[in-house]
């Protein structure tokens, strides 16, 4: 079982000719809503990868909650661990200009109310894979890492978005997944040694005994374990929208580990899923199905 403890949002997206200046009103051409939040996105990706998934998080008692959870429900994700709170459902207000530039305001809402006490709803047990991100209170992420270890579960921590104080508990996770920017920032916070990123990844893995995975967008993915270094190339694609690629990677990676794939195979499968997610607009709607990912993997080999 994969247990995702994380954020659930509804994204409110306005397409505008150009981004407004303070005090200015600009015209828009389209408005859409879409379920989001790193936790929910990753839970759906793990489910589409073929895993059984339980989501632990919170939404509001408002009209946004049902839509925020709609695709998770369709994907047969167990939502028994999702609380209803008096806070609003988490929202991201997004304006996208014709040139692709955007501005985003994220209001955590109910996500900020996910406290360590809620972790009892995860029902952690030996062999589970616990998937975490930094969009809920960091004290809850820290507590989840401790409780998962005590239960004998495997932990995957996606260090997004970057939060400096998260550097203090990175080494509690069995697998740390970061993008280039995040890893470089954590590397500074942790004073990692090495002339380049790969060397600093080796330094982290060697010091902590953990496995660190760094996604490189179009350049693929690198991973360092205490004893080896892996690099997996990316498929060549022309991206339409990269918004859900990182979350898709994380969900597929956790599902692949849970199903017993070796690290290199898990990285290749997650990388293929992440690249396919770039071929459609949106985060959750773009997450590919397992059959499409496995077909893409066969085509590359």
Sequence positions of predicted segments:
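A short, aliphatic-rich alpha-helical micro-motif
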Residues: 124-125, 170-171, 206
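A glycine-rich helix N-cap at a beta->alpha junction
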Residues: 71-86
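Conserved beta-alpha-beta core of the PfkB/ribokinase-like small-molecule kinase fold
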Residues: 129-199, 219-221
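Short gly/ser/thr-rich secondary-structure transition/capping motifs
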Residues: 76, 109-115, 155-161
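Conserved phosphate-binding/catalytic loop of the ribokinase/pfkB sugar-kinase fold
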Residues: 58, 82-84, 94-129, 134
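Glycine-rich phosphate/adenosyl-contacting loop at the front of the ribokinase-like
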Residues: 1-58, 63-70, 74, 238-240
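Conserved phosphate-binding/catalytic region of the ribokinase-like
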Residues: 164-167, 189, 194-301
């Amino acid at each position: 079982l994969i247990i995702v403890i994380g954020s659930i949002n509804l994204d409110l997206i306005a397409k505008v000719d150009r981004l407004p200046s303070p005090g200015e009103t600009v015209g828009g051409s389209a408005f859409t809503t879409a379920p989001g939040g790193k936790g929910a996105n990753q839970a759906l990706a793990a489910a589409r990868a073929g895993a059984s998934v339980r989501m632990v998080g919170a939404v509001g008692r408002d009209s946004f909650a049902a839509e925020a959870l709609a695709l998770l429900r369709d994907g047969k994700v167990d939502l028994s661990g999702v609380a209803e709170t008096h806070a609003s459902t988490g929202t991201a207000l997004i304006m996208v200009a014709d040139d692709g530039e955007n501005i985003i305001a994220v209001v955590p809402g109910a996500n900020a109310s996910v406290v360590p006490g809620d972790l009892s709803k995860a029902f952690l047990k030996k062999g589970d894979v616990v998937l975490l991100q930094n969009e809920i209170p960091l004290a809850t992420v820290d507590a989840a890492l401790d409780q998962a270890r005590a239960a004998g579960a495997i932990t995957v921590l996606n260090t997004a978005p970057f939060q400096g104080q998260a550097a203090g508990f990175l080494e509690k996770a069995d697998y740390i997944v970061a993008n280039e920017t995040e890893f470089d920032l954590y590397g500074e916070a942790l004073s990692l040694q090495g002339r380049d990123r790969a060397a600093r990844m080796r330094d982290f893995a060697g010091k902590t005994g953990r496995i660190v995975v760094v996604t490189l967008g179009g350049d693929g993915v690198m991973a360092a374990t205490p004893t080896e270094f892996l690099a997996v190339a990316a498929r060549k694609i022309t991206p339409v929208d990269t918004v859900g690629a990182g979350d898709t990677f994380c969900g597929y990676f956790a599902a692949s580990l849970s199903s017993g794939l070796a690290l290199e195979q898990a990285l290749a499968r997650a990388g293929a899923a992440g690249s396919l997610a770039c071929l459609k607009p949106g985060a959750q709607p773009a997450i590919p199905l397992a059959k499409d990912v496995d077909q893409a993997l066969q085509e590359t080999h």
